Amino acid sequence: MARYTGPVCKLCRREGFKLYLKGERCFTPKCAVVKRPFAPGQHGSATRKLTQYGMQLRSKQALKRMYGVLEKQFRRYFEIASRKSEETGTALIKVLESRLDNVVYRMGFASSRKQARQLVSHGHVLVNGRKVNKASYSVRPGDIIEIKEKSKAKVPVKEAIEASRNRTTPPWLEIDFDAARGTFVRFPEREEVDIPVDLQSIIELYSK
């Protein structure tokens, strides 16, 4: 399955909540979900009743789109999570949240996960002082993430950092905005991650 390249705001409207795919726009009244809180298309405003399978599929699609992960990789993450000793939904969130592109986004060095993925793949991000250009790289507690010195002056990075200064820092991260550096202190707990997705329905879908 190829990566989606169409208008990302339509994805948020289809799910019925913000996936935070458009960067700073998602935090303003210009957000498509705020302006047009119904699904795209001719019959988008009509009420549609989904089957149980349909609801499970919607939950999976929403989580995949939020983190920018394709089906094959998402299934692998689910298999990893299902082998953990803790509850599968919680483990799945920890796996997704520890992706390097997501950590760069959570630290406020990029305005969206897509932009964070580009920063990583183009070699602008260091992990413990070494360049890592794999967006799916799994960050571990204690790892130090920073933007390369030459890349700190890039306009998208500077704009993202300035916009993030007034937002609440995730409790599992320590961030130095002036240095464009942060520490992944620990894995987040499920209740600390604001994701309006029914994780249990995803577990049921993959358990069939």
UniProtKB/Swiss-Prot annotation:
GO CC, alphabetical: small ribosomal subunit
SUPFAM superfamilies the record matches: Alpha-L RNA-binding motif (SSF55174)
Keyword Ribosomal protein: yes
Keywords: Ribonucleoprotein, Ribosomal protein, RNA-binding, rRNA-binding
Example GO BP: translation
Superkingdom, natural source: Bacteria
Gene3D superfamilies referenced in this protein's UniProt entry, alphabetically: Ribosomal Protein S4 Delta 41, Chain A, domain 1, RNA-binding S4 domain
Limits of the S4 RNA-binding domain: 98-166
Pfam families documented for this protein: Ribosomal_S4, S4
Record GO terms (molecular function): rRNA binding; structural constituent of ribosome
The UniProt record lists the keyword Ribonucleoprotein: yes
NCBIfam families hit by this protein: PRK05327.1, rpsD_bact
Family membership: Belongs to the universal ribosomal protein uS4 family.
Function per UniProt: One of the primary rRNA binding proteins, it binds directly to 16S rRNA where it nucleates assembly of the body of the 30S subunit. With S5 and S12 plays an important role in translational accuracy.
Quaternary assembly: Part of the 30S ribosomal subunit. Contacts protein S5. The interaction surface between S4 and S5 is involved in control of translational fidelity.
Name this polypeptide is given: Small ribosomal subunit protein uS4
Native species: Kosmotoga olearia (strain ATCC BAA-1733 / DSM 21960 / TBF 19.5.1)
